[in-house]
Amino acid sequence: MNNKTFIDNLKELTEPIVNDLDYELYYLEFVNENKENYLRIYIDSESGIGLEDCEKVSRAVSAMLDEKDPIDTSYYLEVSSPGLERQLYDDKHIEDNIGKTACVRLESLFNGGRKFEGKLKSFDNENLTLEINAEDFKIPRKKIKRINLIYEG
């Protein structure tokens, strides 16, 4: 099973549990760091996420994982909020944050830079538009490595 299929399977098993507890499954990843495997589940809600929320989801997901046993290796389960300076992984995340300030990091140089900060203005299949110093700045999406919100307190 390739990694995308593996992740999709985990999402399919996890999302209904998270939703039943009145949270949104923001993102899920399975990573290897320092020779240890981690299943990281990021949850969100309109009212924010606290430690109790993470514990509740962790208990429910852990019970399902014990029952279904979809992961054939040892791992640690981590449940957390995506945070105030959250990474935007997909179109829904970008759409939900139009008008907010973000940092866009690129794979390679573009217009003399690899990092741009500005207000998320719009996006389509080809470009992401930031408003930087009251000017629209289009960045080709294929060059984008990562987008994070910038907390403005």
Curated annotation (Swiss-Prot):
<comment type="similarity">
    <text>Belongs to the RimP family.</text>
</comment>
<dbReference type="GO" id="GO:0006412">
    <property type="term" value="P:translation"/>
</dbReference>
<dbReference type="InterPro" id="IPR036847">
    <property type="entry name" value="RimP_C_sf"/>
</dbReference>
<dbReference type="Pfam" id="PF17384">
    <property type="entry name" value="DUF150_C"/>
</dbReference>
<keyword id="KW-0690">Ribosome biogenesis</keyword>
<dbReference type="InterPro" id="IPR003728">
    <property type="entry name" value="Ribosome_maturation_RimP"/>
</dbReference>
<keyword id="KW-0963">Cytoplasm</keyword>
<dbReference type="GO" id="GO:0000028">
    <property type="term" value="P:ribosomal small subunit assembly"/>
</dbReference>
<comment type="function">
    <text>Required for maturation of 30S ribosomal subunits.</text>
</comment>
<dbReference type="InterPro" id="IPR035956">
    <property type="entry name" value="RimP_N_sf"/>
</dbReference>
<dbReference type="InterPro" id="IPR028989">
    <property type="entry name" value="RimP_N"/>
</dbReference>
<dbReference type="GO" id="GO:0005829">
    <property type="term" value="C:cytosol"/>
</dbReference>
<protein>
    <recommendedName>
        <fullName>Ribosome maturation factor RimP</fullName>
    </recommendedName>
</protein>
<dbReference type="InterPro" id="IPR028998">
    <property type="entry name" value="RimP_C"/>
</dbReference>
<dbReference type="Pfam" id="PF02576">
    <property type="entry name" value="RimP_N"/>
</dbReference>
